[in-house]
């Protein structure tokens, strides 16, 4: 059984880093990894939704993971999302991830066609078989994937010894309780919705993987510590403050990840490009909201850190 301790804590979802032509930038990718190392996070979740994976080629995703591992190996826990909407490419990415020495691979279910549970289980197990020495995390995000991880499907997947748990991004925190109960002490649940990090942790999640963590890692690290210290009143205040920031990050015409990249430029001096079409980049009309979001992060740090 894998040592699950290495997965506990704050694990930001890694952002795609592009050059001015919209191509993957190795240099900017490495700079973002170093930023996260310097902030003190537990690990990174690479090539997931926040990494714009569904708008990238297999080769793009390989390059990103190679650049991440060149900087992060031995310093951060790395979970590589490898799912594509076909089994062959997913298995290729799984083999590649294992060859680089990632800690775990993860997958969403196949999307568009509504497949029966036995087909989803086969898809996941086939991908896992391509990385036989690597831990496996199931990603439950039914509101986007259109497929929910049911108790019966999770029970079936627990027969796979490489399955270590679930990244749960469904909104009901009761789902976390369900997966914790089914998996027991030998498995881990990651909280997915950033707005309920506190609630998810209290329901049994041992860690969080989130798309807004990267804009404010210090705040999520502080929230994680407050939970460990059982200072739940302050933790609730901080969660409310974080949620206000998330409200700003999602209040623009441009896509949230484009906003976060602009916030990182303002607050951290990091330039990692924009977002890839069909995601909408930040517009000039968005600029006041972007500036307000960046300022709110700075103010919240001053208040809680």
Sequence positions of predicted segments:
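Active-site beta->alpha loop and helix N-cap motifs at the rims of alpha/beta catalytic domains
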Residues: 3-12, 17-148, 264
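Charge-dense, low-complexity intrinsically disordered segments
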Residues: 1, 23, 55, 59, ...
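Secondary-structure boundary/capping signal
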Residues: 76-77, 135-136, 165, 187, ...
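Catalytic alpha/beta core domains of metabolic enzymes, predominantly
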Residues: 130, 142-243, 249, 253
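General structural feature for long, well-ordered alpha-helical segments within catalytic domains
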Residues: 25-28, 32, 60, 64, ...
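Short, low-complexity, intrinsically disordered N-terminal peptides in bacterial proteins
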Residues: 1-4, 305
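C-terminal alpha-helical cap/extension of soluble enzyme domains
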Residues: 9-17, 39, 205, 212-305
């Amino acid at each position: 059984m894998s040592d699950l301790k290495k997965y506990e804590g704050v694990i930001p979802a890694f952002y795609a880093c592009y050059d001015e032509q919209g191509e993957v930038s190795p240099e900017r990718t490495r700079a973002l990894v170093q930023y996260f190392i310097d902030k003190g996070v537990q690990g990174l979740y690479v090539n997931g939704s926040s990494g714009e994976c569904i708008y990238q080629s297999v080769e793009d995703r390989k390059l990103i993971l190679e650049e991440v591992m060149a900087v992060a190996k031995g310093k951060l826990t790395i979970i590589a999302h490898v799912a594509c909407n076909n089994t062959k490419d997913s298995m290729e990415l799984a083999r590649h991830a294992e060859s680089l020495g990632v800690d775990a691979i993860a997958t969403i279910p196949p999307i568009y066609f509504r497949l029966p549970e036995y087909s989803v289980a086969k898809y996941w197990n086939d991908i896992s078989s391509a990385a036989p020495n690597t831990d496996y995390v199931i990603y439950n995000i039914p509101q986007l994937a259109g497929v929910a991880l049911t108790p019966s499907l999770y029970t079936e997947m627990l027969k796979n010894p490489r399955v270590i748990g679930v990244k749960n991004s469904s909104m009901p925190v009761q789902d976390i309780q369900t997966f914790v109960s089914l998996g027991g002490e030998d498995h881990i649940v990651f909280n997915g919705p950033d707005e309920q990090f506190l609630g998810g942790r209290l329901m049994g999640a041992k860690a969080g993987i989130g798309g807004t963590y990267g804009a404010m890692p210090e705040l999520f690290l502080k929230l994680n510590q407050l939970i460990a210290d059982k200072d739940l009143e302050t933790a609730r205040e901080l969660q409310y403050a974080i949620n206000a920031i998330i409200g700003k990050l999602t209040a623009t015409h441009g896509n949230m990840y484009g906003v976060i990249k602009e916030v990182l430029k303002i607050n951290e001096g990091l330039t990692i490009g924009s977002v890839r079409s069909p995601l909408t980049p930040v517009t000039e009309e968005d600029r006041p909201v972007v500036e307000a979001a960046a300022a709110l992060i700075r103010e919240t740090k001053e208040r809680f850190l």
